[in-house]
Amino acid sequence: MPMEKTFDPAAIEAKWARLWESRGLFRPHRPDATPFTIVNPPPNVTGALHIGHALDNTLQDVLIRYERLRGKDALWVVGTDHAGIATQMVVERQLNERQQKRTDFTRDEFVDKVWEWKATSGGQITRQLRRLGCSMDWSREQFTMDPHFTRAVVKVFVDLHKKGLIYRDKRLVNWDPKLKTAISDLEVETHEVQGGFWHFKYPLADGVKLDDGHDHIVVATTRPETMLADMAVAVHPDDARYKSVIGKFVELPITGRRVPVVADEHADPELGSGAVKITPGHDFNDFEVGKRAGFKPAEMLNMFDGDANVIQTADGLIPAEYLGLHRFKRDGIDGARELVVQRMKETGFLIPHTDKDGNAHDAEPRTIQTPFGDRGGVVIEPWLTDQWYVDAEKLAQAPIQAVRDGRIQIVPKTWEKTFFNWMENIQPWCVSRQLWWGHRIPAWYAEDGRTFVAETEEEAQAEAGAGVILTRDPDVLDTWFSSALWPFATLGWPDDTELLKRHYPNDVLISGFDILFFWDARMAMQGMEFMGEVPWRTLYLHGLVRAPDGQKMSKSKGNVVDPIGLIDQYGADALRFFMCAMESQGRDIKMDDARLAGYRNFATKLWNAARFCEANGIAASTSLEAPAATLPVNRWIIGEVADTVAAVEAAFAAYRFDDAANAIYSFAWDRFCDWYLELIKPVLSQKPSPLQGRGLGEGDEAVPAPADGPLSPALSPEGEREIAETRAVAGWVLDQILVMLHPFMPFITEELWTGLGDRADYPLITAKWPAPNAARDAAASADIDWLIKLVSELRTAKAELGLPPGARLTAHFPASLKDRADKLAAQLDRLARLETISFDPAPAGASAQLVVEGETITIPLEGVIDIAAERERLTRALAAATKERDSLAGRLNNPSFVERAKPEAVEKARTDHAAKEAEADRLSAALARLG
């Protein structure tokens, strides 16, 4: 059946996604081949595909398809994360819509409802990954709450506890007062908030005074409410103003608490008064200062409950009027902050701020970087609480060494410094969460306070004794704890499965740099602890996908791009190719509709090239090796294929997705479609060149050959051989393009592969990567490269001189080019559109000079154009372009503009300057051609 005239991405995408999966072509099925394994970073089961997912999964699929074509036993592990907080919130919102809440149910009843939600609504993102063309092994789809995965999680927790690497401790956590749980740093977003900077007097106790005679220390704070739990005032040890009072005490207003003045380098002598209030129970920096000052976490004061309402501190010094107040003003009711400021003002301990107009205010206005929970949407409270922690410092040592000795390669290498800096200063990892949905912590408590950690309740009971009443820990594990086991638990661990033996370690992990520490590093820790080997040999970190103006995408900015919408508009192949072509190591990607449209056009061009081949009797190749060829154009294109294969392979080896994509793009569009198919048209049609008989070569007269079917009996044997050779080479080259392009654009390439040949039982996805055994033919390459340069120069000259592309001109060649011109007569006639080629000296007068590889070809212009008028037009245009170019250069050379203007304005000026500079150069060249 002939190919459709137009390319319809939607139709072929649905067809091939279904056929590939139904035929099991995504599964590893080559037991004797070298395995190649990637695990997909498990997206949240609640999630929808965002543009970052599209980039991440496209890069993985490109590698999987590439290695599959190279004959490896490729496994791409797919699955979803149970996403504790996110999933619990989704289900709670559904309950709220029915005027119900989570606490209306028992824990088990609520968890059952979450499982019901997953069964009906939890597969959106996996359906979207299929639309992107991801060739994951869907038959082994994983979920982090599956029974076998849960068994692995519990075993890891218990084993780490036995080794002393998991323990319970009192430390500060990011507490979300709305969700009432600790959250990870990744779930904290920092926003700029307009707030205040209050200055308070803290009286020195026991009659002590500063050297300047003052009886108080001035402290400044953005959180006045936390003074109710202050435990110290810190000053820099070298700050001469306070040396005499280090070790003395201040008596806090409101509470009357005596707190020491401590020396700590955290205090900055250049900032404010140089003294800072220390609240270890509600500030991460203060927590560390407090520990250095000798306070144990158990002694640190906590003034908030889980709702961020004021509670009494352990010393009982907070006045009753503050108890029960929220930390901030809420619903029109003053909070602890407002009341503290009011009391400090009333008692004379508030130092007002005077603005530039002389007006007094309680606080100095400040823009404050404030942490918010990304899901709860409220300000995070650093909160002192008992949680479970992993001794990350000990677990980090093996991955650090693995990166140092090269067992783990981080690409780009520039990320190694960041990796080492974080891992070498790693803090204990809080792994407990106050949720109902998730992996329940396998710990049970006896009434006497003893803790029993075991894989089952029966084991815990046996350890505690038959008569001991046990209560299970109500918390669940951090989602990152379970997903850290992904590289080996998905392969069957803790069972010693064949899949685990074959596919661990994984080969490569593709990850966004933003989860390097939350997921990647923790996988390395757990993998090396429990498997004794690195989880993957290469860690590739990509950047962000940004809005067209370079801003980070966010819902609040309204600049989020839906990848499914892009697939609907441009096709999955175009989106995938865009992601790869733009993926340059260490750089973010800017969305660009023009480029997306360009890659959609690339798919259309490939489709049309295949239609041309079909219409001209060019069929699928039957050989992996290049056909025998004698014609220079065929020998040239075979060499170009070999060079392109080598370039693509080198790019993949270096994880240069952009170089690989651009190499095949350049070859397919430029070399094959724009040049080769044009160059072989004279061969396929066998029309004698009108230049024959003018010294350009000999040849039998020929009649046009039919596009398909038997060759004309009037055609010479040599003509028949040339057509057959050219069809074979063209078919083989198109096959190599389809194979090389398949990892990037799987849908259109599979459709063309099957449509151009009887290969229904030999799909492209399982074909073989090109291995051309032909080297570049230097002579053929030199001839065709020269021809391409000549035609390009001639086309440029026509455009510059305002001549139509089809204008036939006379050209004077140097005698040294006669043999080459004879050999390429047919191609010169078709592509160069020359009326006459002469080897005599050019006549005097205006002419265009084309310099190709050091040889000058002259095109007389007398009688072709109005020389004087054209010179005048070009002179005016050049003056205008030069003026605008110089004006833009002046702006760009002005530091005031470059430093103060919006980045997008500066970038536009640079782009415009480059365009005007190129225009001026082009016009100058055109003037020079006129002589």
Swiss-Prot record:
Motif 'KMSKS' region, residue numbers: 552-556
Annotated GO CC locations: cytosol
Catalyses which reaction(s): tRNA(Val) + L-valine + ATP = L-valyl-tRNA(Val) + AMP + diphosphate
UniProt motif ('HIGH' region) ranges: 43-53
Compositionally biased region (Basic and acidic residues): 353-365
GO MF, one example: valine-tRNA ligase activity
Residues bound to ATP: K555
Key words, A-Z: Aminoacyl-tRNA synthetase, ATP-binding, Coiled coil, Cytoplasm, Ligase, Nucleotide-binding, Protein biosynthesis
InterPro entries: aa-tRNA-synth_I_CS, aa-tRNA-synth_Ia, Anticodon_Ia_Val, M/V/L/I-tRNA-synth_anticd-bd, Rossmann-like_a/b/a_fold, tRNA-bd_arm, tRNAsynth_Ia_anticodon-bd, Val-tRNA_synth_C_sf
Cellular location(s): Cytoplasm
SUPFAM superfamilies: Anticodon-binding domain of a subclass of class I aminoacyl-tRNA synthetases, Nucleotidylyl transferase, tRNA-binding arm, ValRS/IleRS/LeuRS editing domain
Location of the region described as Disordered in the Swiss-Prot/TrEMBL record: 351-370, 691-717
Pfam family, one: Val_tRNA-synt_C
CDD domains: Anticodon_Ia_Val, ValRS_core
Enzyme class name: ligase
Chief site of localization: cytoplasm
EC number(s) stated in the UniProt entry for this protein: 6.1.1.9
BP terms from Gene Ontology: valyl-tRNA aminoacylation
Coiled-coil positions: 864-930
Protein family: Belongs to the class-I aminoacyl-tRNA synthetase family. ValS type 1 subfamily.
Domain-related comment: ValRS has two distinct active sites: one for aminoacylation and one for editing. The misactivated threonine is translocated from the active site to the editing site.
Function: Catalyzes the attachment of valine to tRNA(Val). As ValRS can inadvertently accommodate and process structurally similar amino acids such as threonine, to avoid such errors, it has a 'posttransfer' editing activity that hydrolyzes mischarged Thr-tRNA(Val) in a tRNA-dependent manner.
Quaternary assembly: Monomer.
Protein name as annotated: Valine--tRNA ligase
Origin species: Sphingopyxis alaskensis (strain DSM 13593 / LMG 18877 / RB2256) (Sphingomonas alaskensis)
Gene: valS
